[in-house]
């Protein structure tokens, strides 16, 4: 859109984070299907196939035992319920397993605020698809938003 002759770019936070990680970070050069998962107050997702974003996915709303996944496996829930890393990893593993069976991805990239502590839960995951930490951690969305805006100019 244009406002006062300037372009305005809208991007979901997880999509923006995924753009950054695919261009400069953990997903750079990765073939196949890559899923960016942002874990914070909710769960955000960005899905890339062949390096192209499939925009506006909302798989934080995937059902997990009668609740949205983000009400079971987000970082906010981990903190609210004071879950141990082992219990949190078990919940996150269930979510990633469901995503794995839906998409058969080649890579999961985990970002968001909790990514700074990924060494405490990623080693506890037991899915087939590799899971790596976002290179830009919680700043990936900022970098990706700048990329999206730059692309529009």
Predicted regions and their residues:
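General beta-strand structural signal in soluble alpha/beta enzymes
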Residues: 8-13
């Amino acid at each position: 859109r244009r406002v006062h002759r300037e372009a305005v770019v809208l991007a979901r936070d997880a999509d923006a984070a995924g753009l950054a990680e695919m261009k400069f970070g953990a997903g750079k050069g990765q073939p196949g299907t890559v899923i960016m998962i942002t874990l914070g107050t909710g769960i955000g997702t960005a899905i890339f196939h062949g390096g192209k974003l499939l925009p506006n996915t909302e798989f934080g709303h995937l059902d997990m035992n009668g609740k949205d996944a983000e009400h079971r496996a987000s970082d906010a829930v981990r903190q609210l319920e004071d879950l141990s890393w082992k219990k949190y990893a078990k919940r996150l593993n269930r979510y990633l397993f469901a995503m794995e069976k839906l998409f058969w991805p080649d890579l999961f990239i985990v970002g968001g605020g909790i990514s700074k502590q990924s060494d405490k839960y990623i080693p506890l995951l037991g899915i087939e698809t590799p899971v790596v930490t976002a290179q830009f951690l919680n700043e990936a969305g900022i970098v990706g938003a700048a990329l999206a805006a730059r692309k529009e100019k």
